């Protein structure tokens, strides 16, 4: 399904990013795993990915830094020869009510989640245009659609990703580059482990939290040829939360 493709995944050391990396490797893709600080976890994911018989390498990159992104992408192209798929998954939360939210927390979330997505897309764009092929998958959130309380920073950053996805899709479509977004609901990761799962389940029609593998399966579809006529779309994967 993805044999011969090279995929770049940010935030790949754990959670959704790790699941996507492993799913892509299982389907035959070579994977470049980007992480910010946890090299040990990233190395574990790399070893698991290579067990599928594909190439996997790790790269330290703070996506909020445009220079880090440019350097990482240049190194990846040097190592793999090309990039076919980019998954912008890196993200953080700093939840607080609006009246109590420090300006620093707002800026950090927007810089990592939204500016980081922009930095990575910009760093990869020339590669996609030159190759006349590309799949960009941006991880947004249902928070962008629902405006969850305590998440002014996070919701704004994820809503920005949806808008940026649409604009980039229009710009790059003539170059055979598809740009789509995934909007997960409550997924069982470190980011959601402190939440009251019983209360959350009352709001989800399918009555369960999602798994990172649920998101990875959708990402695999968007990375494959099966989605070649889909671009500029945001697909919810939330158990019906945002119906």
Predicted regions, residues:
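Residue(s) in the substrate-gating loop at a strand-loop-helix junction
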Residues: 141
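Conserved glycine-rich cofactor-binding loop
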Residues: 6, 13-14
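Active-site helix of classical SDR
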Residues: 121, 157, 165
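Substrate-binding pocket helix/loop in short-chain dehydrogenase/reductase
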Residues: 97-98, 102-110, 200
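C-terminal substrate-recognition "lid" of short-chain dehydrogenase/reductases
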Residues: 133, 211-237, 241-242
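Conserved glycine-rich Rossmann-like NAD(P)H-binding loop of the short-chain dehydrogenase/reductase
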Residues: 29-43
């Amino acid at each position: 399904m993805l044999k011969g493709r090279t995929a770049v995944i940010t935030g790949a050391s754990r959670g959704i990013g790790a699941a996507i990396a492993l799913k892509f490797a299982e389907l035959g893709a070579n994977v470049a795993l980007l992480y910010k600080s946890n090299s040990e976890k990233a190395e574990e994911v790399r070893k698991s990915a290579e067990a599928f018989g594909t190439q996997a390498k790790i790269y330290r990159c703070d996506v909020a830094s445009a220079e880090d992104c440019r350097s990482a992408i240049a190194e990846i192209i040097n190592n793999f020869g090309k990039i076919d798929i980019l998954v912008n998954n890196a993200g953080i939360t700093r939840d607080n009510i609006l009246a109590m939210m420090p300006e620093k927390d707002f800026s950090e979330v927007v810089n990592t989640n939204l500016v980081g997505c922009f930095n990575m897309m910009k760093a990869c764009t020339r590669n996609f245009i030159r190759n006349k092929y590309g799949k960009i998958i941006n991880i947004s959130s249902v928070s962008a659609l629902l405006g969850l309380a305590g998440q002014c920073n996070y919701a704004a950053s994820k809503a920005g990703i949806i808008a940026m996805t649409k604009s980039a899709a229009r710009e790059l479509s003539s170059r055979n580059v598809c740009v789509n977004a995934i909007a997960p609901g409550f997924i069982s990761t470190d980011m959601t482990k402190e939440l009251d799962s019983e209360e959350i389940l009352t709001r989800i029609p399918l009555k369960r939290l999602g798994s990172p593998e649920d998101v990875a399966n959708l990402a695999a579809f968007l990375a494959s040829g099966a989605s070649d006529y889909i671009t500029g779309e945001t697909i919810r994967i939330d158990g019906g939360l945002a119906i």
